[in-house]
Design a protein with these regions (language model features):
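Phosphate-binding/switch loop-helix module in NTP-utilizing enzymes
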Residues: 86-154
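Conserved nucleotide-binding/hydrolysis micro-motifs of P-loop NTPases
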Residues: 54-58, 81-85, 128-131, 165-169, ...
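Phosphate-binding/switch region of NTP-binding enzymes
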Residues: 158-222
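Structural recognition of the conserved hydrophobic beta-strand(s) that form the central parallel beta-sheet
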Residues: 50, 122-126, 154-165
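Pre-Walker A adenine-sensing motif
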Residues: 1-12
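Conserved P-loop
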Residues: 24-93
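NTP-binding/hydrolysis catalytic cores, primarily Walker-type P-loop NTPases
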Residues: 2, 15, 97-101, 107-121, ...
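Short hydrophobic/aromatic beta-strand immediately N-terminal to the Walker A/P-loop
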Residues: 18-22
């Protein structure tokens, strides 16, 4: 896994789990998920899928390479920008039937499950906010999210869902994701001795012994490293 992450987690995270990776813009949420999936799969006979709703797969691959994270045959980046474009075209020509993205993600999981079987173990969804923006606002949304999280667990996956959080720490979304999720990993910035330091903090992780302290992280061309607990001032 990511060097130094054993300072935060005392034991392995067993699947199935749905883990929210939250933080303000620019807090390296995408990089963290990339690094974690890539380093985890390196020594495993397993498969991972990175599903992006916001950027193209090509853009993500370029970002990974610039971070020093190599895309392996055990990992695929899938984008849904084509489907979004189809939706917009339908809107212009007057077809009101919109793609059900929750159902689309479920079908995508089933397709990779057929190909890889139980070796398909890790999924990243980038991001929950983008998923909401693609769904029509309705009173059914909370129920749909409950079903969505359950479906991810039923597929025996460790799923990391990226979720934007404002600088004040408040989630800008529906508010029940934290309750539904098995884990919450917060990425942020803290001022230490006049310098801004990136940190990682596990706010919650069911069935896993972990530190709740903020841990400094460093991102270089060779990847991400967890340095150790932040000094409290």
């Amino acid at each position: 896994s990511i060097p130094g992450l054993d300072k935060v987690f005392k034991n392995d995270i067993e699947r199935p789990k749905v883990i929210l990776v939250t933080g303000p813009p620019g807090s390296m949420k995408t990089s963290f998920c990339y690094s974690l999936m890539s380093s985890y799969l390196r020594d495993k006979n397993e498969f991972g899928l990175y599903a992006t709703l916001e950027e193209t797969a090509e853009s993500h691959m370029h970002n990974m390479e610039s971070m020093g994270v190599k895309l392996s045959a055990k990992m695929q980046i899938s984008d849904m920008t084509d489907l979004r474009e189809i939706d917009q075209i339908d809107e212009v020509i007057g077809d009101s039937a919109q793609t059900d993205y929750v159902l689309f993600i479920e079908k995508m999981i089933q397709r990779f499950r057929r190909t890889h079987g139980d070796k398909f173990s890790v999924l990243v969804i980038d991001s929950l906010g983008a998923l909401y923006s693609l769904m029509s606002e309705s009173a059914e949304m909370r129920k749909k999210m409950f079903y969505f999280f359950k479906m991810l667990r039923d597929n025996n996956l460790t799923t990391f869902i990226i979720m934007e959080r404002s600088l004040t720490g408040e989630s800008q979304l529906l508010g029940n994701e934290g309750f539904l999720a098995d884990g919450i990993v917060m990425l942020g910035l803290d001022r230490q001795r006049g310098k801004l330091v990136r940190y990682l903090q596990v706010e919650k992780m069911r069935a896993s012994e972990h530190s709740m302290e903020k841990h400094a992280i460093e991102v270089t061309k060779s990847g991400m490293t967890v340095l150790g607990p932040l000094l409290t001032t």
